[in-house]
UniProtKB/Swiss-Prot annotation:
CDD domains: Ribosomal_L22. InterPro entries: Ribosomal_uL22 (IPR001063), Ribosomal_uL22_bac/chlpt-type (IPR005727), Ribosomal_uL22_bac/org-type (IPR047867), Ribosomal_uL22_sf (IPR036394). Disulfide bonds: none annotated. Part of the 50S ribosomal subunit. It comes from the Bacteria. Belongs to the universal ribosomal protein uL22 family. This is Large ribosomal subunit protein uL22. The gene is rplV. One of its GO terms (molecular function) is structural constituent of ribosome. One of its GO terms (cellular component) is cytosolic large ribosomal subunit. Pfam families: Ribosomal_L22.
Amino acid sequence: MQVKAEARYIRVSPQKARLVVDLIRGQQAGKALTTLRTTNKRIAPTVEKVLQSAIANATNRNENVDVDQLFVTEAYVNEGPRMKRVRPAPMGRAYRYQRRLAHIVIKVTEKEA
């Protein structure tokens, strides 16, 4: 049984979020939580919340699920919409820049013993 959790419109560059998500793909859920707690990146606590949500979704859907047998089968980051912003520049001009948003998706599956 595959269970999904996602966080949408997270204010982080998808490229930076992928660095953290790539660390936990394929890991056992408990080990992935430990990895995220020790990772020194700004997005790591957010990814940890998404993973905890996926684990909670699995236990809510099926009370017989063994949390120790849950594995991260899919974890990916998609690009969200971009917020366009303006920075004041010299001589009355303005420079445009974009703030990137990300959608984080984590799927966990119970591995058969």
